Amino acid sequence: MEEYQVYLELDGYQQYDFLYPLLFREYIYALAHDYALNRSRISLENGTYDNKSSSLSVKRLITRMYQRIPLSISTNDSNQNQFFGHNNNLYSQMISEGFAVIVEIPFSLRLVSFLEGKEIEKSHNFQSIHSIFPFFEDKFSHLNYVLDVLIPHPIRPEILVQTLRYWVKDAPFLHLLRFFLHEYFNWNSLITRKKSISIFSKSNPRLFLFLYNSHVCEYESILLFLRNQSSHLRSTSSGIFLERIYFYRKVEHLVQVLANDFQDILWLFKDPFMHYVRYQGKSILASKDRPLVMNKWKYYLIHLWQWHFHMWSEPGRVHIKHFYKHSINCLGYLFSVRLNPLVVRSQMLENSFIIDNAMKKFDTTVPIIPLIGSLTKARFCNTLXHPISKPTRADSSDSHIIDRFVRICRNLSHYHSGSSKKKSLYRIKYILRLSCVKSLVRKHKNTVRAFLKRLGSEFVEEFLTEEEHVLSLIFPRASSTSRRLYRGRIWYLDIFCINDLVNHE
């Protein structure tokens, strides 16, 4: 990879047709199975390649796509449809993997070189989802209003292709990608008209997640540029995504015009307390400013999507919420800022005063209703949250069934360990524990009381989380101390993905 690094580096003011010649070289297809790119400390992918994605098959299929062989594909979404004489899902996944490898190579190299130039510490702890929550706790407790934004998604593949024009100045490759996306759009297997962010198929996540993120980064770069005009602490983590051809010239000209003619409008963007966070298909824009300014931001985002990115967005997709009156659903938690009244009695000479203070506290709770809905879909309980028996295989052993429920329970407890109120978490653990018992009772055709009597306390100990075991070992005689520490919020730096039950959105 080092010998190709100089060749693949992009110059923002020149045009390099780097992807087109690489499509016809042998080594580019082998990169799909080469882990040299993955051995770097920074990786842009969420998983590994499928062994079925043969580099030779990818090469042949891309070559036949260039030859424009007529396709005979029915309109029905079926796995039996033939794509170049082969199974649709299998070979479309091969092609998408080939596209993803080719597109990600220059961006991976530029990202690594960017981080080396900035001397940013490459710690794996920064990849943890829980590392975001201390930032919320430190910053959001001083803010007043928040924009809860549901990001619109492009329903036409042409919008995704146009987004890449700022990154890739290679017409043949863009035409090939456009042809591939339009064929998928006709099959209605990867891109659909659903409202959720799950418009991309789970079997082909890499390429389409890259396209979606690059599309969202287009409008985020504008927001970040305007945000940094008034901030002394410039953002560096997203600096690699801000490199656009003629982008800074356009925005600087826009800011100059606004500064000369519309001083009040420019003041909208000069907010040093503005914080932006994006997760899945939503984003949060929090500020300490007044509701009028937040309303301006709302309609600014809507017009930016509609007129600049050609995406229809309704005003109802952007909600203005007061932090002290509403909660924000983010990453499986409900965030809110609670005002705790504090009465202090002060005495000066013969006069005494009573001072009322309101202390702000950042509150994190478990969204019990959506989580019970996820347990209902997974058939752990009914709609009323009453535990039910989950069907199991006849040849499954009791230890295997218990280990499965214990693993689910510990993962949920591990992820929601930062909750300030553990009662909801205890209820979820109770549902899983009793569902496990009913599943075993159903298998052995016994009663719940008789089964629990036979297992005893060993069954309950299986569901204890790791932190409970550790605290009980540290404080064996001070049970109240360990109980108080466990009830507090605990953030972990080893959580890299959201559990399927937590990801109920």
Swiss-Prot record:
One of its GO terms (biological process) is mRNA processing. It is found in: Plastid, Chloroplast. Pfam families: Intron_maturas2, MatK_N. One of its GO terms (cellular component) is chloroplast. GO terms for molecular function: RNA binding. Keywords: Chloroplast, mRNA processing, Plastid, RNA-binding, tRNA processing. Belongs to the intron maturase 2 family. MatK subfamily. Usually encoded in the trnK tRNA gene intron. Probably assists in splicing its own and other chloroplast group II introns. HAMAP family: MatK. This is Maturase K. It comes from Pleiogynium timoriense (Burdekin plum). The gene is matK.
